[in-house]
């Protein structure tokens, strides 16, 4: 058992079972022992636990830079434009976007104030060292305010802790984490989540994460804004399809899917498909206008129309093909844009 596993075990032995969302939060975000708090251990790379669009190469950042530039131009090229990136991992996307913006338009680059939101102190220190003042690393956006800007969130929503439920005897039960003979084990209790009730016996699924508390601070911070969420996920109809009997929760360790979420707490990634319907509902309640989601292949192709005409190198074309390939990132990932305030959305289509 891991050090974090021992801490969680001691907690449930003393205080009783905890929700899976609570367990997942500890596994990923414990300030010293959580998966994302591990210093010096690569999680995103060919040698880590998973790859992302960012680790494919700099083209992903270039394409997003083109999208931001179009939005900036459509809204009068303001002298100050704030970009907020939550959960920036090692800062590579930030640097790729800033370099691409510099090449696109020095005027746009001088207007950009780039903020990286990272609540984990160990991550903030490493980000500050890597970014070297090119972006400001903040612990919370609560005290910040910007007239106009954008949020870029790549593979963030899938790492928000989710509760787990299963159907038994026509009722929903919440799956809990408890102790059994010195090890972590499953428990359950009756529950009444806001989930469909016409699903089969034994059906297991995730409930939505706590989206409101995550999305409200950046919505308050950016008065007029374009928010771009890129992630793997489904709408509610597909997510809670009767045939999807085992849910979407997955564990990753060194590019392999692991079978058991209770194994190696803090040492493996835990993730679940994003419920885009739930995201849209919260966004609407926060005053956003929702724009139709599209798969990453279509989205990046629209973003990169001008870039594709600029004679990119064979290496860049190879990266682009990986990013839009239907069996890789292109078909599995979706981009959801939303705008708030008095802005021109600078429609891609």
Where is each model-derived feature located?
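A short SAM/SAH-binding and catalytic strip from SAM-dependent methyltransferases
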Residues: 147-169, 205-209, 217-228
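Conserved protein kinase catalytic core
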Residues: 91, 124, 160-161, 237
């Amino acid at each position: 058992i891991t050090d974090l596993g021992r801490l969680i075990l001691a907690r449930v032995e003393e205080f009783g079972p905890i929700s899976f969302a609570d367990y997942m939060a500890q596994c990923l975000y414990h300030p010293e022992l959580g998966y994302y708090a591990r210093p010096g251990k690569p999680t995103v790379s060919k040698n880590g636990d998973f790859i992302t669009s960012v680790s494919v190469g700099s083209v992903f950042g270039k394409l997003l830079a083109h999208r931001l530039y179009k939005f900036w131009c459509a809204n009068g090229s303001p002298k100050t434009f704030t970009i907020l990136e939550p959960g920036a991992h090692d800062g590579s996307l930030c640097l790729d976007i800033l370099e691409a913006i510099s090449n696109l338009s020095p005027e746009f680059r001088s207007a950009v104030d780039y903020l990286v939101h990272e609540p984990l102190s160990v991550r903030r220190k490493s980000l500050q060292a890597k970014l070297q003042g090119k972006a400001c690393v903040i612990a919370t956006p609560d005290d910040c305010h910007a007239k106009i800007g954008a949020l870029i969130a790549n593979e963030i929503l899938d790492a928000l802790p989710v509760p787990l439920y299963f159907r038994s005897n026509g009722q929903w039960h919440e799956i809990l984490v408890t102790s059994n003979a010195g090890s972590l084990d499953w428990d359950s209790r009756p529950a009444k989540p806001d989930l469909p009730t016409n699903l089969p016996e034994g059906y297991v699924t995730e409930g939505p994460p706590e989206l409101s508390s995550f999305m409200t601070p950046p919505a308050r911070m950016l008065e007029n804004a374009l928010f771009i969420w890129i992630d793997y996920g489904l709408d509610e109809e597909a997510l809670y399809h009767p045939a999807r009997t085992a849910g979407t929760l997955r564990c990753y360790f060194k590019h392999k899917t692991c079978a058991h979420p209770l194994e190696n707490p803090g040492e493996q990634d835990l993730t679940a498909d994003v419920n885009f319907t739930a995201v849209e509902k919260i966004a609407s309640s926060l005053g956003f206008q929702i724009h139709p989601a599209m798969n990453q292949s279509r989205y990046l192709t629209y973003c990169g129309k001008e870039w594709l005409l600029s004679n990119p190198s064979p290496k860049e074309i190879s990266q682009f093909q990986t990013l839009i390939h239907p069996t890789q990132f292109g078909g599995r990932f979706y981009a959801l844009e939303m705008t708030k305030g008095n802005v021109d959305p600078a429609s891609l289509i």
